[in-house]
């Protein structure tokens, strides 16, 4: 922040909203000025994630990640001064409306300098929209870039002002799935399960989603249409897949929906050779809840202990980060662990490089110029499919039985050859 007190003029965005909406006068600017010029200045980071509700698996490792990086965030040097990064976390309750509400609270009441979010479009999009409306620097992950960008009505030639995202895209997951399915003993007939939500509408989109590239690759896709999340009856979809002779089932589902579908599929005699589902099959707890019917299911793999990347914050390898979580929690590692950690790697890097931490525009400029290596791979917003987006590598694999339990094994890496394969896909 500049010494002449211009922080009270953070544009006609955030401050004007604060004064109009909350009836605050100069106090917020004074408080921020005091924070910035204190002997041990603090940057406040708002953090939104689904701690409760059907997406809670994505936030399972939150406490571990924040505790493990607390020391690293307690002293980050910027322009010769040591800054402390204070993280204020709020629960979206797996509800996009609630995500927007808590994001607004973080921005307008807690006066955060940066806001971050992860875990599907239901969290990422409403948080990003609140940040964009208020001119607040925002970094997000854990959501394919198309539902993030186009789900927010983004225009590729314009992008956004203050909101930035790193993750893979639908082109990557489609490529990984097609590579996974390339078995001559399996008919190229696919049943698609796409919910009526941001993810489902993006994955099922005729042009940007699965239908066109599957057709171009020679696959016949049966798409019975969008179903409502938390549905209790998938009989229509199962009947359509059986009639079409589908030997592959794919889509994007929340865990409760897949559990319902897979149980009813067994009861109604649907026997696909390959089942590859996005989102629902990321978590060991979900696969374990399916019993023997969980073995052999397949999914995208964003991050694993075998990924050849390390943390810029702690120096840990992917293997060390995963093992640390397992020891501390007595639970299996999960894929979001790497991305939650990387989110704060990027925050710390931005805090180090920003020319003036008292000015949102300076923080946004530092985000835009990010070019770093994280535990999930490179993050560089000068390279991306559209403005404000940069991509991370993606592979795919299968839940296989090892040592008496289900383990996620990378079985194809054509989309990211630097990530090693651990086995071959086994048909159901």
Region spans (language model):
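Extracytoplasmic "Venus flytrap"
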Residues: 46-67, 90-96, 119-120, 193-204, ...
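Beta-alpha junction/loop-to-helix N-cap segments that form part of ligand/metal-binding clefts
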Residues: 57-64, 76-153, 227-234, 259
């Amino acid at each position: 922040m500049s010494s002449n007190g211009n922080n009270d003029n953070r544009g006609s965005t955030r401050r004007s909203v604060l004064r109009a909406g909350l009836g605050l006068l100069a106090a917020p600017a004074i408080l921020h000025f005091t924070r910035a010029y204190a002997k041990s200045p603090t940057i406040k980071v708002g953090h939104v994630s689904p701690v409760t509700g059907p997406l809670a698996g994505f936030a399972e490792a939150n406490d571990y990640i924040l505790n493990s990086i607390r020391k690293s965030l307690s002293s980050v040097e910027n322009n010769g001064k040591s800054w402390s990064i204070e993280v204020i976390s709020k629960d979206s309750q797996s509800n996009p409306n609630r995500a927007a509400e808590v994001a607004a609270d973080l921005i307008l009441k807690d006066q955060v300098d940066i806001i971050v979010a992860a875990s599907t479009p239901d969290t990422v999009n409403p948080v990003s929209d609140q940040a964009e409306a208020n001119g607040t620097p925002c970094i997000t992950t854990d959501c394919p870039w198309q539902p993030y960008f186009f789900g927010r009505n983004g225009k590729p030639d314009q992008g956004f002002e203050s909101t930035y995202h790193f993750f893979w895209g639908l082109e990557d997951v489609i490529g990984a799935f097609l590579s996974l399915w390339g078995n001559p003993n399996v008919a190229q007939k696919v049943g698609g399960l796409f919910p009526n939500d941001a993810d489902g509408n993006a994955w099922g989109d005729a042009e940007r989603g699965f239908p066109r590239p599957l057709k171009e690759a020679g696959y016949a896709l049966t798409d019975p249409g969008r179903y409502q999340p938390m549905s209790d009856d998938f009989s229509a979809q199962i009947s359509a897949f059986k009639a079409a002779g589908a030997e592959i089932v794919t889509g994007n589902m929340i865990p409760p929906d897949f559990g319902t579908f897979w149980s009813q599929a067994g009861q109604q005699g649907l026997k696909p050779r390959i089942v590859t589902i996005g989102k629902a099959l990321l978590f060991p707890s979900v696969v374990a809840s399916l019993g023997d019917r969980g073995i052999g299911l397949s999914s995208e793999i964003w991050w694993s202990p075998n990924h050849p990347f390390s943390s810029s914050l702690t120096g840990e390898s992917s293997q060390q980060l995963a093992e640390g979580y397992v020891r501390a929690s007595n639970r299996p590692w999960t894929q979001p662990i790497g991305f939650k950690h990387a989110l704060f790697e990027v925050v710390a890097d931005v805090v180090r490089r920003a020319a003036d931490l008292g000015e949102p525009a300076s923080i946004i400029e530092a985000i835009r110029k990010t070019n770093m290596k994280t535990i999930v791979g490179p993050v560089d917003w000068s390279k991306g499919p559209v403005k404000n987006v940069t991509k991370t590598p993606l592979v795919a694999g299968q839940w296989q039985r090892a040592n008496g339990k289900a383990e996620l094994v990378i079985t194809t890496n054509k989309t990211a050859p630097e990530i090693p394969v651990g086995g071959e896909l086994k048909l159901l």
